[in-house]
């Protein structure tokens, strides 16, 4: 009997030590390569530290983040965009490989975009057929007369869209959002026609006048049934979703190992205006990502404190 009691006590002590170890492990927060995601990640990290949770930031591509979340080598993604991430997110949540941690108030759109002055050269815009007819105006010296569309490094089927809609464009994939804004600033300064990947919420809408290209309205069948849409031979003969969702995701173990942090994450909620203003702190006001996060954190204490569950304060 005494031996059994000792064994039980030892086992309980072992599990207690394991729980303490898990609670003291760093929460691994994913950072990608666009401003709002990076700053919101650092804001989230600061909130977690008020709960006594140590954090670290894991820089990883959007394509690699899913495996990291599924394996538990990363814990938190604060921005899951419907337009670029819905397929992987939905599949992995359905497979119970990752966890849906809730939805922001913000609604999203990701699409081809142009500055308003381009309409003087191509007056049929924002209709996509006008863009197709005006392709030559978007050519560059090394594009052999093809229009150039500047894409980001995210998972968009732009080349498939160009093929399906028979557009005389080539897709140039840039490495980051910063490189997109370099091209935009250069073109805007000289009033050069440009069409590039843009999204909302984003700081661009507070700095530049412009519009999204209006492609055929998105339907899920556009991605799975060639017969659907304007071209019965190819998929992706449509635009991207409008008024898309912006979600949060975690590893499956996160809610058990970090209960208060998980409950807080579910409460964290940003709207379009907040995300645009946060992005502008970096891309317009030239703050670092960390400084922007600190500034927002200090100026919005009542808001983020309202996200903390009462039992965790």
Regions found by a protein language model. Give the residues of each.
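A conserved helix-loop-strand patch within extracytoplasmic ligand-binding domains
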Residues: 97-150
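A bilobed periplasmic-binding-protein/Venus flytrap-type ligand-binding module shared by bacterial periplasmic
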Residues: 110-121, 244-257, 280-281
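Short helix-initiation/N-cap motifs at beta->coil->alpha
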Residues: 34-35, 53-70, 173-183
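C-terminal lobe and pocket-closing loops
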Residues: 204-264, 268
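Pocket-flanking alpha-helical
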Residues: 41, 60-96, 183, 203-207
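Ligand-binding pocket segment of bilobal, Venus flytrap-like solute-binding proteins
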Residues: 74-78, 149-224
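Short, well-ordered beta-strand elements
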Residues: 24-36, 53-58, 146-150, 265
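C-terminal functional modules
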Residues: 241, 254-255, 262-313
């Amino acid at each position: 009997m005494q031996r059994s009691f000792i064994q039980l006590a030892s086992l309980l002590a072992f599990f207690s030590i394991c729980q303490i170890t898990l609670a003291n492990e760093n929460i691994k927060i994913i950072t990608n390569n666009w401003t709002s995601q990076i700053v919101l990640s650092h804001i989230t990290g600061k909130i977690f530290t008020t709960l006594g949770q140590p954090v670290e930031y894991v820089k990883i591509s959007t394509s690699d983040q899913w495996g990291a979340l599924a394996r538990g080598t990363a814990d938190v993604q604060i921005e899951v965009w419907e337009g670029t991430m819905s397929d992987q997110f939905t599949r992995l949540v359905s497979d119970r490989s990752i966890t849906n941690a809730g939805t922001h108030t913000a609604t999203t759109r990701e699409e081809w975009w142009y500055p308003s002055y381009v309409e003087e050269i191509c007056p049929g815009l924002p209709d996509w057929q006008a863009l197709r007819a005006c392709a030559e105006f978007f050519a560059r010296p090394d594009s052999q007369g093809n229009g150039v569309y500047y894409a980001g490094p995210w998972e968009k089927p732009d080349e498939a869209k160009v093929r399906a809609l028979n557009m005389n464009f080539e897709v140039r994939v840039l490495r980051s959002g910063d490189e997109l804004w370099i091209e935009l600033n250069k073109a805007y300064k000289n009033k050069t026609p440009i069409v590039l990947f843009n999204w909302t919420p984003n700081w661009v809408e507070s700095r530049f006048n412009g519009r999204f290209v209006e492609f055929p309205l998105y339907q899920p069948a556009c991605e799975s049934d060639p017969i659907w849409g304007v071209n019965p031979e190819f998929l992706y003969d449509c635009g991207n979703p409008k008024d898309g969702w912006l979600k949060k995701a975690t590893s499956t173990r996160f809610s058990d190992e970090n209960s208060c942090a998980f409950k807080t994450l579910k409460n964290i909620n940003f709207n379009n205006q907040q995300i645009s203003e946060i992005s502008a702190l970096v891309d317009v006001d030239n703050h670092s990502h960390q400084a922007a996060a600190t500034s927002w954190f200090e100026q919005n204490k009542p808001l983020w404190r309202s996200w903390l569950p009462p039992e965790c304060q």
